[in-house]
Amino acid sequence: MYTMELRFIRGGVCAVDGVLAAGCREGKYGVGLIINRGSTAAAVFTSNRVRAEPVKLTERVIADGSISAIVANSGNANCFTGREGMDDARRMARKVAESLSMDESEVAVASTGVIGRRMPIDKIEFLIQSAAAQLENSEAASGALAEAIMTTDTFPKEVAVEFELETGEKARIGAVAKGSGMIAPNMATMLSFITTDVDASSSELTEALRVAVDESFNMLIVDGDESTNDMVIISSTRTSGRIDSNFREALVAVCRELARMMARDGEGVTKSFQVDVVNAGTHEDAKMAARAIAGSSLVKTAIFGADPNWGRIVAAAGYSGAEFDPEEISVTLESDSESVVIVDHGDILAFEGTEELETAERVMTSKEIRIIVDLAAGDESATAYGCDLTYDYVRINAEYTT
């Protein structure tokens, strides 16, 4: 899948030397800190017209291409909170700055949780102070950070890789993320913080991050709702070799791994699935078809019900806007242990009484399923990620205050 060797390692954001992290939680509220003083940075933010106050603040903070700290809280989104909400976001930055002897203009702020309620700022400031006293460069510190920013997540999400740049120098990327519900392009209800040691300017990091986000988080659909607080930030110590194509490929791999974790952790999820659209006429066609299939409520419910309903898959491809000949489409279902072609160049193979249908039904009982759709229209491909739509999803969101 990748043109170079990637070694997955432990450590999350702290896999990069010099990066400090910490996380504290008290009840439903948590605070995570990442310290990377004077780092080169770039970010991608939600495209929702309703934007949370920390998103607005961090856009300004990161505009000069450098940050020293990231503070993120869970339990309150600080969105639709007006001037008071912006004051609260600034107080978070100020508390970090005071605790760590830096300027508040160097502090990026992120929030996730309930929309439309004032931040319990005194509690958040207390948690910031507590986290600041626990900062260290360790696997445990990154893990505490990942846990502190969880909301409806059921497990913390971290990944780190080591790889060689084209010069032969070793480089690293580490990351944490949160996200399980309200996930749809563009981006997802998610926060992700990425660290690296590659030598790159802010504009170079921005370009690489946008490509990686587009090929990963923007191809992830849990429930089709787009958040007000989405944020992906990358910061670099610039202590390794120059940015190159190997770094860009590794960054895509890291973001895709986080996206897969989020798909597995969608609210109420019992199964996750990957949609690979191959042999499309254009890359955009491949992406449109993959997104449509991964986002289809009918496909999601078929996954939940272990129903190999190929009709829902081809219907979603058909309304996606991708150009292809329906009489040439092929569909394959795969699990870790077996694979079956259910539609072959427009011919239905999986119908009542066939071995193909029996195999397809077994595949659909797997916890992780791969759907391969061959459009037979070119040589472009794309991958999207999704999860099933369950009774528990409805229950969780019926009981959760927006």
Swiss-Prot record:
Chief location of this protein within or outside the cell: cytoplasm
NCBIfam families the record matches: ArgJ (TIGR00120), PRK05388.1 (NF003802)
Role according to the record: Catalyzes the transfer of the acetyl group from N(2)-acetylornithine to glutamate, forming N-acetylglutamate and L-ornithine.
Family from the record: Belongs to the ArgJ family.
Keyword annotations from UniProtKB, A to Z: Acyltransferase, Amino-acid biosynthesis, Arginine biosynthesis, Autocatalytic cleavage, Cytoplasm, Transferase
UniProt-recorded name of the protein: Glutamate N-acetyltransferase
One record GO biological process: ornithine biosynthetic process
Subcellular location: Cytoplasm
Site label Cleavage, positions: 188-189
Residues the UniProt record annotates as site (Involved in the stabilization of negative charge on the oxyanion by the formation of the oxyanion hole): 112-113
UniProt enzyme class: transferase
Active site positions, chain numbering: 189 (nucleophile)
Subunit structure: Heterotetramer of two alpha and two beta chains.
GO molecular function: glutamate N-acetyltransferase activity; L-glutamate N-acetyltransferase activity
Designated gene of the protein: argJ
One GO CC annotation: cytoplasm
Residues that hold substrate according to the record: 151, 178, 189, 267, 397, 402
Pfam family, one: ArgJ
UniProt xrefs under InterPro entries: Arg_biosynth_ArgJ, ArgJ-like_dom_sf, ArgJ_beta_C
Catalytic activity as recorded in UniProt: N(2)-acetyl-L-ornithine + L-glutamate = N-acetyl-L-glutamate + L-ornithine
Superkingdom: Archaea
